[in-house]
Amino acid sequence: MLSINRNAGMFVLPDFKQIQIDSFRHFLTDLLRLELQRFGTIKHANQQLEFKLLGELYRLEIPKFNEREAVYQSATYSSNLYAPAYLVDKKRGIIQKQTVFLGSIPLMSARGTFVIRGVSRCIVSQLLRSPGIYYTLSVQGVYTATIICNSGKSFKLELDRQGCLWVRVGRNSKAPLLLLLIALGLEMRYIPPMIVQRTKKLNQLLLCVEDAKIDLCKRLKLKQKTTQIELGVTDPIYSLFLKPYELGRMGRLNLNKRLNLRVSEFEILLRSQDLIVASDYLVQVSNGIGSLDDIDDLKHKRVKWVSDLFCVQLNMALKKLNVAVHTNLNKMEARISRMSLKSVVSSNAIATTFFRFVASYQLSQFLDQTNPLSEIVHKRKLSLLGPGGLTPRTARFRVRDIHPSQYGRICPVQTAEGQNAGVVNSFTICAHIGDNGAIKTSLYKVCTNSMQGHVIDMLPGEDEYSTIATESCLVVANSSNQFQSIPAQHRREFVTLRWDEIGFRNTLPVHSFSVGVVLIPFLEHDDATRALMGSNMQRQAVPLLKLERPIVGTGIESQVALDSGTVITAVQECKIHNVDATQIAYVPKDSFELLYINLLNYERSNNATCLHQRPIVECGETVQKGQLIADGSATVDGELALGKNVLVAYMPWEGYNFEDAVLINERLIYEDVYTSLHIERYEAEARETNQAIETITKQIPHLNAHVLRHLDETGVVSLGAWVETGDVLVGKLTAKQSEGLLHTPESKLLQDILGVQAFGTQDTCLKVPTRGEGRVIDVRWITRDNHLLGHRKVIHVYILQERKIQVGDKVAGRHGNKGVVSRILPRQDMPYLQDGTPVDMVLSPLGVPSRMNVGQVFECLLGLAGGYLNQHYRIMPFDERYGRESSRKLVFSELYKASQTTNYPWIFEPDSPGKSRLFDGRTGEVFNQPVTVGRAYMFKLIHQVDDKIHARSTGPYALVTQQPVRGRSRQGGQRVGEMEVWAFQGFGAACVLQELLTTKSDHATARAEAPNAIVTGNLVPKPIGTSDCLGVLIRELQCLGIQLDHTMLSQHNMIQYPNLNEE
């Protein structure tokens, strides 16, 4: 009898941010020491001076700022790197030993992020092909052996249909393999006859080594290398095939395993013997001996994570440091008496390299902090893009598609939308990275002895020949299940096997999905496309002012909240001493020391949402280790809470929910159901340089006193002030040289005599932009001194905005059901239930059947029952393993229980279960058909109308076309296109259309005359002549040799043609 050890085989979900933290810890503890040890000794050219770095004794200093202070001061969260070094003067017998400063290294915070100049950033892991050799067969019948090096470069050995062996570098250049071996210096007697026989025009290739090198470079179309050989400058074969194609330790191991070689793993360069063995195996594969490789299999790929990327950057920085030390030693030879270690070592190499890497590297991205879920998902992304990887244009469909080896490792649902679909993916909840960058997954081992069941971690290649149950049915340890047929995976195929043939099973039903997808209840009832949209839109949900956890969830909400770092748990057993809005004071057990925990208090995130923490403990309360003591800005009792449980009805209402539009109740506004807080930051900078002086002051000439009313004596807005559009936040005057005084000779002479400059002032105040009104909650002064930029004062003003839901805002559910608010109805006009409760939202019923996301119906009905029973449900997806129609049975049973408890029989009507009769709030009449009503968990997304809507009266114009520029940020205007012209034509608004296309667009002369006519009270004159855009078109056609001309048409110059109908 087969069974599964449920007690000894307990499985705990890994920390969702552990991939980032473990990788950086590996860099600090292992790779950093290894790279510093390789730095070695640097000797001067004349062997007099010698520099040696003791890298194994390195030391990292405690950071100057912690993470929160770095954000507050707009600084970098980093640590200074020190190491002892020797400087030896052999001629004089002097040895200097000193601990030198090598540079600063950015540190990862406890949340898995980097803080660079006050901005949180995240480094995305990259999926690359593992170095080694791979055999494939093309559509044209050409067998190929692709050799991939450690840096991502590759070249190919080809066996064409005629049986000839070639080496190909790039797409369009190839040469015989025999020619390459001769150029590498291999004698003919050591080259196997098989390679010689498979070479065309053999007589032309029997050359000496130097001639072979020239011929090889010509065939590979390398003219520059050919010239270098002829001049005897360098050997290009080493720089072409040996140095760039460094296999590395992993590549050598893979090559040894694939070709059955016994070469030391420290032999990291490609050898000529490797090419001979690789070509021999290529011929065997063409004869049916051996096997081809699936290049898209995960066993042939590796993850390049934070530690690998930092190690590459450190290697580059140490090479720069090596060059700098050599240069400084040469300079020191002339003044050897003043020899010092500080003048030899330059700290700019490491600091500059790491800063540029974290600040501008393609995979170092601006952290998405819309909500805690978006932060977690961003840290668990896996990208095929980046240096050494693919681009959206070169990524084929086969690369983007789902591969069976990704089962349990890469989520098949959550990916980017658009051109990055299938290229940017996410790790599953059970995936973690092992040695050499392989993605592991956790599986339960099924065995005959229940005492031996345990969880194991499997590499991508290890589970290929294993039988894995996909957890679609409930596992019960009895004899009746021994011969039960269940779905399973075997040899990259999904098959049906008996229980006695199963070797492993999943640890969770959602074993194969990512964090964002697991949060969708009733996931198995949704189409994959809608599940993708639902998981992506959860990351766009805005934290609300009044939080509410979902009635229907999956049970992963608490894990997401805990791993996101937004909640605070007790690190030890203690007693709470004092609690306020900014900190929690506690006394540990068996101690009398008073410790403090600082809380976030209305801090701004990267996406302008509010970061805030609320204590949930009281003074005198005793808490245990791991107990929750503070909630975050999007959590309730330690569970993720991004939306609200609102009463929804699926029905049409006067066309206002046409095409996914949403009709909402005004209660959502008055009761702040969907009110959110947003914090905008505005920056003003004052510099003091030799060219100009900028002054922060309250005395601003030519400005109305009303817009300066909130400034204090220093010229900065006061805390707590309510500011509106146009109000001055920071008063600033910029001194500029007055041009009017320089035209007279007397003023120039006076300036030369007195040595003073004539300056004027310019108003450069920081003002509140359009739709930027709010409450000032913080003002921060940051002072920096830079020898290039001079003395700088930076002022950050933070304004808190309270945004209620309004027409144009976007709302969405967890099942991809999204829409835009089209109208807000009074609560008395909304449809209401039989108990008199008006619904909160009216959704379109057409959004369910065609999109196949039936999970939202199960969710809203179960939410309705939970609302009346005051219960919360945590249901893991794929509950069909408990039996057929398990979801429907559960929902109907809970609805029946709610109807019995509340004595409302209409909650569950047997004739139409899940539906009830609604009444029209305007007339009081009942609707014709029963309507599906329930409580759905709906979000308000960050795509808000306040950030999208834009109006323009006048503004900048493009220089060439003289049309309004594009974009809200540039105060641009929307062009009237073809469809807009049709709309005006349909209404017959000819004069309006004529103005839009000429005076208000690109007719510069008419545009200048229109304001004068309006001011003087005259009629706006009609435009005369053509517009500038037509002139641009004429010039472009003339460049193509096409001349446009115009002629007045009249009866005199029109040609009369005979009427053909008369014939």
From Swiss-Prot:
Provide the protein's localization: Plastid, Chloroplast
Q: Which UniProt keywords apply?
A: Chloroplast, DNA-directed RNA polymerase, Nucleotidyltransferase, Plastid, Transcription, Transferase
Which EC class does it fall in? Answer: transferase
Q: Does the keyword Metal-binding apply?
A: no
Give one Pfam family, short name only.
Answer: RNA_pol_Rpb2_6
Q: Which reaction does it catalyse?
A: RNA(n) + a ribonucleoside 5'-triphosphate = RNA(n+1) + diphosphate
Its assembly, as annotated, is: In plastids the minimal PEP RNA polymerase catalytic core is composed of four subunits: alpha, beta, beta', and beta''. When a (nuclear-encoded) sigma factor is associated with the core the holoenzyme is formed, which can initiate transcription.
Family listed? Belongs to the RNA polymerase beta chain family.
Q: What is this protein called?
A: DNA-directed RNA polymerase subunit beta
